[in-house]
């Protein structure tokens, strides 16, 4: 045995070191005894024996007294060193470079204490920090209990991090290991068995809310949360799901069964004032939730007044070039009140009603048209369900402003030139495409010479003929020259706009009522009796918008542009007037605020007729005296533009109205400045900054529209 000792005037130190021989080296054992020794001297002695570099904080002062009767190896000797310092309020903090720092224990919390884990938990009185996750217990609730078991006055501390539900514990390794064992024992899954309680009379949502409110009251009265059951309502099956500790679960189930009892009062009556929906319409929807009965005396279909399914605007006796707009909306106040239902509600104050059966319970729903309200008599649970349905249906429906541009251009060029000859003895050359046959002219002239009157056929031919006709009638010879060059244009321009509710059909109609002869008969007194019907011609626009997801609008369109054919048209006959009709029936999907071309037509018709006398008509120069030529070229262009704008609130509606008024007012002022008080349709505008002009539409088809041979 090798002995080593240090003696001071204020104390003594004895230390014995044993070196055990082995083939590879020596193993050291230590025995220590200190009495009244300066603590810094004690630290220096241990540092020298363990061959460690130790930094001593200046605040480390005092004397120690300790004695060891057993022999210790290096590990035990180091733990003995840590325990002595812990008793006197000091701690050792190891550094990354192997240096040890001796500081006061209360200052060690902010030092770089090693992070321990299950593989390296630390030994004895070493300072360590552990991060312990919790799975079943709230770290916030467990942390205060663990602080009481740790050395909070010294280097120990316990904090929790609620977002991750973890504990952060710092202290002596042995103490922290004991705290971790306690946490693992407490953090276990409790009894979470679930029980489903079906309800017969009560509402699952109401029962679950009531039981949870009682649990919150118990929690405030310091009842542990583990002793409370979790209660969740299943509205689909009208049942309540209960989970938790067995005793808490049994208490909750018993409470639920006590609440699920048949009510003495089977029903109540409530008046619900609607804000936007129509009471008569909602009756049909609510009646679809149950089995309809025939107990009520009045049927909703019989007493329901005929309500228009769409908003409409019309104008008659107007010119083709026009623009107009119309809108419709509805609103009403909202409130509800409970009241008794007696004979005060007779057939004069309510219109329409149904008695239906929902979940085996009788429900009566009536509509009061004057106040746009519903009178419902139903059990409380059914009443709540109906109120939820009504609140979801009684909403402000968005509106759609539909703006259209209808541009139609017609151009017709015609040429009619011919010469007809006649001889009373030799015959005649007659061409029917000239408008006046020479035979009619000769017979009419003979009668006029004899008695001074015209034949009916001659008078009719002259009244319907346009152009120049000239000739001579001398002796047996007569000649008739007819000439007509026509150039007609017809422009139909309109910018109708209409506002309608979502999924509501709207109609715009601007036109004239044109009389059409449908029959004629002669009475016994030789009076002619005519039967006349009137046909509407003009511009008709019928649209039904449907707002879809993503602010897209599905437009169902029915558009018609009709007019009376020109009197010079070849399609006109003595049977009556001819109508030009263009119809578009379509459905398109348009994004809110975008313009779409719904339909278009580019049409060209050419008719040419050449009549001549054989051989004579082919003679150069002189052949023109024996020919008749008729030529007609018609071109027609029709385009229809639509632009929907969704209006969801009154502010957007007001803005759209102001923009329309300003556009109209500016055009009116401009026309008045030019000396014309009536707006022309050379410029067609859509709101939102998009402008389309008649000339732009015309120029886009200019290649097709160029006149030929002119």
From Swiss-Prot:
Sorted UniProt keywords: Cell outer membrane, Membrane, Protein transport, Signal, Transmembrane, Transmembrane beta strand, Transport
Residue ranges of the region described as S domain: 691-710
Domain notes: The N0, N1, N2 and N3 domains are periplasmic, while the secretin and S domains form a channel that is partially inserted in the outer membrane. The N1, N2 and N3 domains each form a periplasmic ring. The secretin domain forms a double beta-barrel structure; the outer barrel has a diameter of about 110 Angstroms while the inner barrel forms the central gate with a small pore in the closed state. The S domain interacts with pilotin OutS.
N1: region residues: 123-190
Lineage, uppermost ranks: Bacteria, Pseudomonadati, Pseudomonadota, Gammaproteobacteria, Enterobacterales
Family: Belongs to the bacterial secretin family. GSP D subfamily.
Major location (coarse): membrane
Signal peptide, first to last residue: 1-27
Organism: Dickeya dadantii (strain 3937) (Erwinia chrysanthemi (strain 3937))
Protein name: Secretin OutD
PROSITE patterns, alphabetized: T2SP_D
Residue span of region N2: 192-262
Transmembrane is among the record's keywords: yes
Subunit organization: Forms a cylindrical channel with 15 subunits. Interacts with pilotin OutS.
Function text: Involved in a type II secretion system (T2SS, formerly general secretion pathway, GSP) for the export of proteins. Required for the translocation of the multiple pectic enzymes. This subunit forms the outer membrane channel.
Gene that produces this protein: outD
Protein location: Cell outer membrane
Transmembrane is among the record's keywords: yes
